[in-house]
């Protein structure tokens, strides 16, 4: 009826069934194998917290104890050989080298909202330029592909990630910046 391929319908059905199984045990952390599967299938710590009814901190702590942490893959940008442009996954080895340089992490504005101009993005771009001029490695975290801050050459490194606690803490833990703007 919808012309959506059966494969995609089946994948969605499997995710719904996985969510229902997780929600059946409200108030307690899922079994280790269920938590690992949920992370590999794209369930965020925050969403798991909401459907299971336990704190996001509890889920994050258990996930880290199990060694289930984000890895980063490079985005291949047309015309560049080694762009420092990354997205996270729980399904691969980490391919993101980390330097020992002095770094500052800049959090972008995320998705545009009604009434929001580009002023904040302009500030992020100029912060990156000023910090580079001062000798810092600059790291931008943002998820809006229509901003200048997500251009591959604006910062030394770009994480194309949602601005969630899970993602920002994971990047912070990996990069160990001196500060966050």
Task: Identify the function of each model-found stretch.
Residues 1-181:
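ATP-dependent carboxylate/acyl-activation modules
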């Amino acid at each position: 009826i919808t012309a959506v391929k059966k494969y995609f319908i089946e994948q969605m059905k499997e995710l719904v069934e996985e969510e229902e199984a997780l929600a059946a045990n409200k108030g307690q952390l899922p079994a280790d194998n269920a938590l690992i599967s949920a992370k590999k299938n794209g369930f965020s710590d925050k969403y798991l917290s909401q459907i299971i009814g336990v704190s996001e901190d509890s889920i994050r702590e258990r996930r880290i104890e199990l060694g289930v942490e984000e890895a980063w893959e490079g985005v291949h940008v047309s015309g560049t050989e080694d762009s420092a442009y990354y997205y996270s996954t729980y399904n691969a080895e980490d391919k993101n080298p980390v330097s020992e340089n002095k770094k500052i992490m800049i959090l972008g504005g995320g998705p545009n909202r009604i009434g929001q101009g580009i002023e904040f993005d302009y500030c992020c771009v100029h912060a990156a330029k000023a910090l580079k001029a001062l000798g810092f490695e600059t790291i931008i975290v943002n998820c809006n592909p229509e901003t200048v801050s997500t251009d591959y050459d604006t910062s030394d490194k770009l994480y194309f990630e949602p601005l969630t606690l899970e993602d920002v803490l994971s990047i912070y833990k990996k990069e160990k910046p001196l500060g966050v703007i």
